[in-house]
Every structure is written in structure tokens, then in C-alpha cells.
Amino acid sequence: IQTKHFTLALNLLVALFFVTVLVLKKGYSYVPMVLGGISVIYALVYFFKFKQKWQLAKADKWLIFSFLFYFITFMLSIIINKDSFREIDNPSRILLFIPLLLLFSQFPIKIKTILYSVPVGAMITGLTALFQKFQLGYLKPFPEIMHIQVGNIAISLATYSFVIAIYFTVKKEYKSALFSFIGVMLAMSTSALSGARGGWVGLPIVLLTILFLYRQ
């Protein structure tokens, strides 16, 4: 497989994550699992077959350290409290981010993949939620997913889309900015329809911080 084809496939997977994160049941798990599996296989080939040395930037080292610290903290908590080791399942998944860093350093994700897939995902999520609520008569959108998760994921999509909208505004790409703002509104409507309130608590602080950082 050629490098450009492999890079394209990775970009499509990343875009697919934002588009399917709520639309599919456990959509937030499928793409990360596939990417995690690919990254582990690539890391094994990279280190043991080709015997390459990974040159880490300082920021990457701190990020990897934070992942390891997070995992070790959970491990110590389980050992001290004598909890079931099944509790380590979710925290252990964060370790998959380490080989992902290697994978994305060799096959970079294009910035446009993020800039457009996030608002598209926000819009698809919002339109699906509105259809389920007002056309299908669901009490809450995405009933197969816990409503707190739905609300928080939707707010995250709205926040990311808001940052992207500001970016496009600064770049004077106003059509793309409007597109992103529509994604913001639709994602926020999803969160509102879900009935979850947790994500809304920190939203004003996050938005004000973003505006402060982009004040120039």
C-alpha cells in the first residue's frame, strides 16, 4: 500500500469519527478502536522490523508522561483499594494514544480534515437529533446512548465547531465560518434535547476563554 493511500485512509477514519460519534451506537468507540489497532501494529513494525528510533519533541514527551501518569494513578488506586482489575479497562485505553502519536507523526492528519469533519459531524448529529425528536417522537434523541454522554459529546462538538468558526472568520473565509456556526447551533440543540445539563455548566467559561484567546 502506498504512503499517500494509507495517509488518505487515516484521514478518512479521523473524519468518520466526528461524523459517526453519536449517529451510530457506540460510534465513539469504533473508529478509535480501529485506529488504535492500526497504530499498535505500525509501532511493532516500526520498532522491531525496521528498528527505527522515535525522535520525540518535548511536547510529545510531556503528553506521553501525562498518559502514563493517568494510567499509573488508576492502577495504584485499584491496588490500594483492592478493587476489581476490570476497573482498569477504560483507563488502559488511553495508552493507545501513545502509538497513535507515532502513527500520526509519520502519516500526518491534514488540518482541513479536522476543520470540515467537525462541523459536518455537528450538523449531522443535530439534524438526526431533531428528526428523532420531532418526526419520530422520541422522548430524547439517541435513546440507545446514555443521555449524559449524548449531551456532553454534543457540547464538545459545538465547542470545537465554535473554535473552527472563529478560525475561518479570522481567515476571512466567511462561508466556511457560517457553515461552522450552523454546526454550533445544531450541536447545541442536540445537547438541549438530551436533557443533560453538565456540559452547559462549563460552556460559558470555555467560550469566554476562547474569545479571550482570539481577542486580537
PLM-predicted stretches and their roles:
Residues 1-75, 109, 116, 166-177, ...:
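Transmembrane signal-anchor hairpin modules in multi-pass inner-membrane enzymes, especially those
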Residues 53-59, 85-88, 108-114, 136-141:
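A cytosolic-side transmembrane-helix exit/cap motif
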Residues 39-40, 96, 109-137, 148-216:
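Alpha-helical transmembrane segments of multi-pass inner-membrane proteins
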Residues 18-26, 76-81, 103-104, 187-194, ...:
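Hydrophobic alpha-helical transmembrane segments
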Residues 62-72, 82-104, 113, 117, ...:
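Aromatic-anchored transmembrane helix interface
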Residues 14-18, 135-144:
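Juxtamembrane membrane-water interface segments that cap and precede transmembrane helices
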Residues 25-35, 86-91, 143-159, 195-199:
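Membrane-interface micro-motifs in multi-pass membrane enzymes
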Residues 74-82, 130-139:
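Juxtamembrane "helix-exit" motif on the non-cytosolic side of transmembrane helices
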